[in-house]
C-alpha cells in the first residue's frame, strides 16, 4: 500500500479490526520510509449485479438508489439513519445471496416494501405510493386495508401471548 504522504510503496500494519458494518476490515498502517500513519479499509470485491428494469433495460445494482428512495419515504418520520442503514444492508445482502448475476427491479421493490412494512407503516405507504404507481384512490385504500389487517393481526398475537 503506497503512503499518501511520500508515495513510498511499503507500509506495515499497526492495527487491524473489523469495521462497524461487519463487512469491512479497518487497518492502521505506517509508512516504512516517513513513518506517517494512515487508515485503509478492505472489503470483499463483489461481482457486478445487474438490475432488469420493467422496460427490459439493464443497469448495475445501486445501493444508493435504494437508499435515496427509502430516505425520501422516511422524511419527518421517527426512523433513525441507523434503522435505514440496517434495512438497506439487509436488502443488499438478500439480493446478493439470492440472485447470482441479475435481479428484477420488481424483486428489489418487493424486498424494500417487506422491510419498510416492518419498520414504519407511513414510510411503507409513502414508498409504495411511488413504487406501485397507484392509478386511483381505490388502490391506495386496498393497501391501507392490508396494513390495517396486518397490524390487527400483530396486536391479536401480542394479546394472546400476554394472556398465555
Swiss-Prot record:
One of its GO terms (molecular function) is ATP binding. The keyword Acyltransferase does not apply. Binds 1 zinc ion. Pfam families: ATP-cone, Zn_ribbon_NrdR. Keywords: ATP-binding, DNA-binding, Metal-binding, Nucleotide-binding, Repressor, Transcription, Transcription regulation, Zinc, Zinc-finger. PROSITE patterns: ATP_CONE (PS51161). The keyword Plastid does not apply. Residues 49-139 form the ATP-cone domain. GO terms for biological process: negative regulation of DNA-templated transcription. A zinc finger (unnamed) spans 3-34. This is Transcriptional repressor NrdR. It comes from Streptococcus pyogenes serotype M1. The lineage of its organism: Bacteria, Bacillati, Bacillota, Bacilli, Lactobacillales. The gene is nrdR.
Amino acid at each position: 500500500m503506497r503512503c499518501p504522504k511520500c508515495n513510498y510503496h511499503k507500509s506495515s500494519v499497526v492495527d487491524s479490526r473489523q469495521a462497524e458494518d461487519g463487512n469491512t476490515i479497518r487497518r492502521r498502517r505506517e509508512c516504512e520510509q516517513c513513518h506517517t500513519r494512515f487508515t485503509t479499509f478492505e472489503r470483499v470485491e463483489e461481482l457486478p449485479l445487474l438490475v432488469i428494469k420493467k422496460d427490459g433495460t439493464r443497469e448495475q445494482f445501486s445501493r444508493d438508489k435504494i437508499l435515496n428512495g427509502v430516505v425520501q419515504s422516511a422524511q419527518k418520520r421517527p426512523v433513525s439513519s441507523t434503522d435505514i442503514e440496517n434495512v438497506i444492508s439487509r436488502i443488499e445482502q438478500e439480493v446478493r445471496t439470492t440472485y447470482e448475476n441479475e435481479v428484477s427491479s420488481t424483486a428489489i421493490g418487493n424486498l424494500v416494501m417487506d422491510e419498510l412494512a416492518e419498520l414504519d407503516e407511513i414510510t411503507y405507504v409513502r414508498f409504495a405510493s411511488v413504487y406501485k404507481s397507484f392509478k386511483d384512490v381505490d388502490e391506495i385504500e386496498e393497501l391501507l386495508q392490508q396494513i390495517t389487517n396486518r397490524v390487527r393481526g400483530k396486536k391479536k398475537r401480542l394479546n394472546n401471548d400476554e394472556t398465555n
